[in-house]
Swiss-Prot record:
Keywords: Ribonucleoprotein, Ribosomal protein. This is Large ribosomal subunit protein bL17. It comes from the Bacteria. One of its GO terms (biological process) is translation. Residues 148-187 have a biased composition (Acidic residues). Part of the 50S ribosomal subunit. Contacts protein L32. Residues 136-197 are annotated as: Disordered.
Length: 197
């Protein structure tokens, strides 16, 4: 008997499972978003991402590998001409699984699996920031004596700036503390005068 695949078993036998995943992948590439059970979505994700990776290569051998799973030539054409170019800059994570409410009939946990077609701009900004930080670190390594003195004076100035702020807050706390006992003393005096009457 063949070793079962990792993850939940989806159908009766291995052939049924392969065909079910192939049909799910075909529907995903055709509609770019499908609703299915969580177990099927989790099993579909690695297959779909591997097929998109083949499509990003774009050669004939990759197209034939994809055609062994996805039998619809129109969907394969869409995958290679529209979806793969949209994912060209993305290094992975081509799909997104979002859990939705349970199915009405049998209360099965449902999920939406969709292709992530948004551009990858936030990552590019992070990469640019990281390269700038690397350049700054290289400059500091070249001339470490002068920036250290500047940092020390900046640190002294910041400590001096913080110290008056702490004194101001301490004065406010003391003033509030001074007012509170006086109010309490007046209230006590009124109570004692009421009891004497």
């Amino acid at each position: 008997m063949p070793t079962p695949t990792k993850g939940p078993r989806l159908g009766g036998g291995p052939a049924h499972e392969r065909l079910m995943l192939a049909n799910l992948a075909t529907a995903l590439f055709e509609h770019e978003r499908i609703t299915t059970t969580e177990a099927k979505a989790k099993r579909l994700r690695p297959l779909a991402e591997r097929l998109i990776t083949f499509a990003k290569r774009g050669d004939l051998a990759s197209r034939r590998r994809v055609l062994t799973v996805v039998k619809d030539k129109g969907v394969v054409h869409t995958l290679f001409t529209e979806i793969a170019p949209a994912m060209a800059e993305r290094p992975g994570g081509y799909t997104r699984i979002t859990k939705v409410g349970p199915r009405k009939g049998d209360n099965a946990p449902m999920a939406v699996i969709e292709l992530v077609l948004e551009p990858l701009s936030p990552k590019q900004a992070t990469v640019a920031e990281a390269t700038a930080a690397t350049k700054r670190a290289a400059k500091k390594a070249d001339a470490p004596q002068e920036p250290v003195a500047d940092e020390a004076t900046d640190a002294d100035e910041s400590v001096e700036d913080e110290a008056p702020a702490q004194d101001d807050s301490a004065d406010e706390v003391e003033a509030a503390a001074d007012e509170t006992p006086a109010d309490d003393a007046e209230a006590d005096a009124e109570k004692s005068s009421d009891t004497e009457k």
